[in-house]
Swiss-Prot record:
It comes from the Eukaryota. It is found in: Nucleus membrane; Nucleus, Nucleolus. SMART domains: Fungal_trans, GAL4. The chain crosses the membrane at residues 501-523. It is a single-pass membrane protein. It comes from Schizosaccharomyces pombe (strain 972 / ATCC 24843) (Fission yeast). Keywords: DNA-binding, Membrane, Metal-binding, Nucleus, Transcription, Transcription regulation, Transmembrane, Transmembrane helix, Zinc. This is Uncharacterized transcriptional regulatory protein C1773.12. GO terms for cellular component: nuclear chromosome; nuclear membrane; nucleolus; nucleus. CDD domains: fungal_TF_MHR, GAL4. Disulfide bonds: none annotated. It holds the Pfam family Fungal_trans. GO terms for biological process: DNA-templated transcription; positive regulation of transcription by RNA polymerase II.
């Protein structure tokens, strides 16, 4: 068999096989994966108007030189050049005027005006920019020193556009006993909440791999090395970062082999999902986004969003397909909300049942993972409905349709909260009321309590999406305070098991949304006394501390969020200090700030 050269056939693999490309990507799929120059990239073609070169009224960059015009005078040439310079200067002046208008629009930015035309839930970058606009609106001469002003943040600042460049793969097969411990850790802490693999089937392939490495090939090996990378990165080894990156490099090397993305298979979706989790740890969000797009294409090709029509399909296989689909659904929806990109799976007509709890032991040893998984599925479905029925239809739908959608989603939120399983309900009510930590929260129950904190944060963020701070300010402020209190009050319970939570934690339960609302409340001075403002500032400090602690889990992403949070806290402190020094004279305060 003649080996396929990766560099010369990357584009041809997409073109000849008529492989569907992700609409967001400017390149074909293989060129994105191989980081190559694409020959079939989407270029914007500009039609050139037909110009009569003999028309003296048409000014071009250089006058055409014909045989009949060889004796053109020097004065005529200078006249044409002068005319070109005048046109160039006029274009520059027009561009300068438009830039000045844009700058004036930024200075006069008003959040309430933006909401009327917005048809999408604000992305994380937009939320950070809103904080920056609010600082400029209320404190134009604020002497704060920003590394990057919040209003100047872009997607590239928060999510670096980079791919892995490691060339040192893990060349030796991991020792079996060590690998077995890593696999056990993965199934106990990760696969329990995000069930991608059947434990029994995975261990059968694991034993076959170590008995004869030639029998086990393909996507399972990619998943194996990615699982090893996840487990080693959470271990206590001193060289864990080096070893985990080397193991992940092996997965990345295997994925780049020609043909991996040409056919859709369930084991490939499983491998890509594991790799997405590790990419989040290394802050390789461009790669995370690309792999997520490839994962969604395979999900659509296999019709995992539909129930199996063949009655002879094995129940366990059917259940595995459901769990893989819903895991991809949660990851894709959550990352698209953070990135601000259109949903890939949210717009599908989903006809897939929720996972059954009867086959739970095949995926995990504990029951808590399945309970959390099903609860998060239902919340993610509600988030997608908010996105489609509230934001997308806000400008086009009639008032009756809009009110009907609001009532429907509000009812689903109430039903979701009432139907929580008993295992979560007892702790969920304590967290909701900001009560003291129950005495029965020992080491065994710590994971269930932490899962309740995660579910409660996800519920609060879903409510903030639904109510929208610009239309239901008081309600959202109360929800944001409760979300911050959950982290502030139960941080001591979450902290000991940081190493056991998913690397996509900040994507799934990002508390920057409540942070932004608390910050806006301090600067807007709309509601609350001075004591309440100081209490909100303390809540912001708690969230900042949480971002700092999450650096070990989410790396550069958490580090950048902590810097943004600290800049906002400095601005809020400066604002409160000026307010207290001026007293109740609001006119004097405005003159100092603006």
């Amino acid at each position: 068999m003649v080996p396929i050269k990766k560099i010369s056939t990357a584009c041809d693999l997409c073109r000849q096989r008529k492989l569907r490309c992700n609409g967001e990507l400017p390149k074909c799929q293989n060129c994105v994966v191989y980081s190559e120059t694409c020959k079939y990239n989407k270029r914007k073609r500009v039609k050139k108007p037909n110009v009569d070169k003999d028309d003296p009224h048409i000014v071009v960059g250089q006058p055409p030189v014909k045989k009949s015009t060889a004796g053109i005078t020097r004065e005529y040439t200078e006249m044409i050049e002068l005319r070109n310079h005048i046109i160039t200067l006029s274009k520059r002046s027009v561009n300068m005027e438009s830039r000045i208008d844009d700058m004036l629009n930024l200075l006069n930015y008003d959040l309430s005006e933006k909401r009327e035309t917005s048809n999408e839930i604000p992305s994380l970058v937009q939320q950070i920019q809103n904080c920056g606009f609010l600082i400029d609106e209320k404190m134009r001469r604020y002497p704060g020193i920003f590394q990057i002003h919040p209003k100047d943040y872009t997607m590239n600042d928060l999510f670096p556009q980079s791919f892995p460049t490691w060339i040192s793969v893990y060349r030796n097969v991991p020792e079996k006993a060590w690998a077995n411990r890593c696999v056990e850790w993965y199934f106990r802490y990760i696969n329990s909440c995000w069930p991608l693999f059947d434990l029994e089937n995975f261990m059968d392939l694991f034993d076959n791999f170590y008995s004869d490495k030639e029998k086990t090939k393909g996507a399972w090996v990619v998943s194996f090395y990615a699982i090893m990378a996840l487990a080693v990165s959470r271990s206590k080894r001193k060289d864990k970062e080096k070893i985990s990156k080397s193991l992940f490099s092996t997965s990345w090397f295997l994925v780049q082999k020609p043909g991996f993305f040409l056919t859709a298979r369930l084991d490939k979706i499983q491998a890509l999902t594991i790799m997405i989790q590790f990419c989040a740890h290394l802050s390789l969000y461009n790669l995370c986004k690309v792999l997520c797009g490839q994962m969604c294409l395979m999900v659509k090709d296999l019709d995992l969003h539909k129930e199996a029509t063949n009655p002879n399909v094995d129940i366990e296989v059917d259940e595995l397909n459901r769990r893989v689909f819903w895991t991809c659904y949660i990851f894709e929806t959550t990352t698209s909300l953070i990135f601000g990109t259109p949903p890939e799976l949210g717009d599908l007509e989903i006809d897939c049942q929720l996972p059954s709890m009867d086959v739970l032991p095949r995926f995990t040893e504990s029951s808590q993972g399945g309970i959390v998984f099903c609860s998060e599925i239902q919340l993610t479905i509600i988030k997608n409905e908010i996105r489609k029925k509230i934001y997308k239809c806000l400008a086009s739908a009639s008032e009756e349709v809009y009110k009907e959608a609001v009532l429907s989603i509000r009812g689903k939120l109430i039903v979701w909260e009432r139907n929580l399983p008993d295992e979560l309900k007892q702790y969920y009510d304590v967290i909701k009321l900001n009560g003291t930590i129950p005495k029965n929260v020992d080491f065994e129950n710590q994971h269930i309590f932490t899962a309740c904190v995660e579910i409660y944060l996800s519920y609060c963020i879903t409510q903030l999406y639904f109510y929208d701070p610009l239309t239901n300010y008081e309600t959202c402020l109360e929800i944001a305070r409760k979300a911050a209190d959950a982290i502030r009050s139960y941080f001591m319970v979450i902290e000991p098991i940081f190493k056991k939570i998913c690397y996509l934690w900040l994507f799934l339960y990002c508390p920057f949304t409540p942070f932004q609302i608390l910050f806006s409340n301090i600067l807007k001075m709309e509601k609350g006394t001075s004591d309440e403002k100081i209490e909100d500032l303390d809540r912001m400090y708690s969230l900042y501390r949480f971002f700092v602690e999450m650096k070990e889990i989410n790396g550069e992403f958490a580090d950048k969020l902590s810097r943004v949070a600290l800049d906002c806290i400095d601005a809020a402190e400066h604002y409160l200090e000026l307010k207290s020094s001026v007293g109740s004279n609001i006119f004097e305060l405005e003159s100092l700030l603006v």
